[in-house]
């Protein structure tokens, strides 16, 4: 988590040193922080089996929970900066227009991925908190790929499929997750429309 923040600060400083606007610097910072976080998480838990998943998820770390909350807030806040960057792109000429649009698209993709990665960790932690359970994964003990399946299903469809949520604490987090995912979906649609309109206007 500390590496994510440090990387983001370095990216912002470099961008500002090269004369980038505050919005571009902010997106560069959030992009690098998200990239470091995503890589760190999946290198740490990507190959964990069910037993390792349970062991990792049961580790209570208040700083980790706080860092995840900061990442979620930063991901949502970056959407505002993306909107501003797209307005800059609309007024810019080539090749700046294409670069700003590409930065906005990449920023949304990284923020979207980091939000769902945070929820993978949260669902695992909730599942293994007392009383254990809250999600029906069938007869086999879940690993992180199962929690990724749950998080991505909610993130892309705003609902669960064949993994019933049986605990109120999990349903509450799933509701917040679905609402945040809907916000990202709306922004992705807006970026698509903006990009197509820009191409047609050239």
Language-model regions, residue ranges each:
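The first (N-terminal) embedded transmembrane alpha-helix
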Residues: 1-17, 76
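Alpha-helical transmembrane segments
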Residues: 19-37, 99-115
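Membrane-water interface of transmembrane alpha-helices
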Residues: 37-50, 117-128
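Membrane-helix interface/capping segments
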Residues: 42-60, 83-93
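Juxtamembrane helix-capping/reentrant segments at transmembrane boundaries
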Residues: 53-73
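Alpha-helical transmembrane segments and their membrane-interface junctions
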Residues: 75-96, 154-168
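Membrane-proximal soluble regions of multi-pass membrane proteins
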Residues: 125-167
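Pore domain of cation channels
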Residues: 146-153, 163-201
């Amino acid at each position: 988590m500390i590496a994510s923040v440090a990387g983001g600060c370095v990216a912002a400083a470099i961008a500002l040193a090269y004369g980038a606007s505050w919005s571009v610097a902010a997106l560069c910072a959030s992009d690098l922080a998200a990239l470091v976080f995503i890589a760190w998480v999946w290198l740490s838990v990507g190959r964990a089996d069910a037993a390792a998943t349970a062991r990792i998820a049961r580790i209570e770390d208040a700083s980790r929970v706080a860092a995840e909350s900061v990442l979620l807030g930063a991901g949502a806040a970056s959407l505002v900066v993306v909107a501003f960057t797209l307005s800059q792109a609309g007024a810019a000429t080539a090749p700046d227009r294409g670069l700003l649009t590409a930065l906005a698209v990449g920023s949304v993709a990284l923020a979207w991925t980091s939000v769902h990665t945070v929820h993978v960790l949260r669902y695992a932690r909730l599942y293994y908190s007392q009383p254990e359970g809250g999600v029906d994964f069938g007869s086999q003990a879940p690993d992180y790929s199962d929690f990724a399946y749950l998080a991505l299903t909610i993130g892309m469809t705003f609902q669960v499929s064949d993994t019933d949520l049986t605990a109120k604490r999990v349903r509450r987090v799933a509701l917040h997750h679905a609402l945040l995912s809907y916000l990202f979906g709306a922004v992705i649609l807006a970026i698509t429309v903006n990009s197509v309109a820009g191409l047609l206007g050239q």
